């Protein structure tokens, strides 16, 4: 595709400033942006430490707290900023603003009373005064009950005690289970023997 053909296609779709080349004319699509009235005006704002310079001046003019800091030189202001952990770079007005805002914030923090939430008691009863007599009585009775309950029940059961309570249906079930397991055990070796075909 030649440049002149490309120029015709673009000129049909866009209207713009004609770019003069050696013997050829070409309409560029970005020229629409240049035709807009605000495209030539470029506004520049000077920012120092992410704050506009004009706002510094209005802040200093309106604030009455700067009088103690105005006497200091830039070097002393930087030392003050360093002692408070603030940024050290910038003009005198920047340093003044940082110091004043830091002091005003610290005054607000010190004047605010911090309310601690009340601790809630969950499932805790109020303390009760316990006497020695009360504790000794309860402990003795509890131990006594446990010992007497252990002495009443037999610890080891003998086989005759276990089998004495078998019912006739339990005996029939156990006998049938024993017979089936014996039959199954006898059939298993016959199935596992290899058969030899002649």
From Swiss-Prot:
GO terms for cellular component: mitochondrial membrane. The chain crosses the membrane at residues 172-187. Keywords: Membrane, Mitochondrion, Transit peptide, Transmembrane, Transmembrane helix. It is found in: Mitochondrion membrane. It is a single-pass membrane protein. It holds the Pfam family SAP. Residues 69-103 form the SAP domain. The keyword DNA repair does not apply. Residues 1-55 form a transit peptide. Belongs to the AIM34 family. This is Altered inheritance of mitochondria protein 34, mitochondrial.
């Amino acid at each position: 595709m030649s440049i002149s053909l490309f120029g015709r296609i673009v000129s049909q779709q866009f209207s713009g400033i004609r770019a003069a080349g050696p013997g050829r004319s070409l309409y560029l699509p970005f020229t629409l942006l240049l035709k807009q009235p605000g495209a030539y005006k470029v506004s520049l704002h000077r920012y120092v430490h992410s704050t506009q310079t004009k706002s510094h001046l209005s802040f200093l003019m309106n604030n009455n707290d700067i009088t103690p800091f105005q006497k200091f030189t830039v070097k002393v202001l930087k030392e003050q900023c360093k002692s408070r952990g603030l940024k050290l770079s910038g003009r005198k007005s920047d340093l003044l603003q940082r110091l004043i805002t830091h002091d005003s914030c610290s005054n607000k923090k010190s004047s605010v009373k911090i309310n601690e939430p009340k601790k809630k008691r969950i499932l805790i009863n109020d303390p009760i005064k316990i006497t020695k007599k009360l504790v000794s009585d309860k402990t003795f009775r509890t131990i006594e009950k446990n010992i007497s309950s252990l002495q009443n029940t037999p610890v080891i059961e003998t086989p005759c005690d276990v089998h004495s309570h078998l019912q006739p249906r339990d005996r029939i079930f156990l006998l049938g289970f024993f017979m089936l397991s014996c039959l199954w055990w006898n059939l298993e070796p016959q199935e596992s023997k290899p058969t030899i075909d002649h």
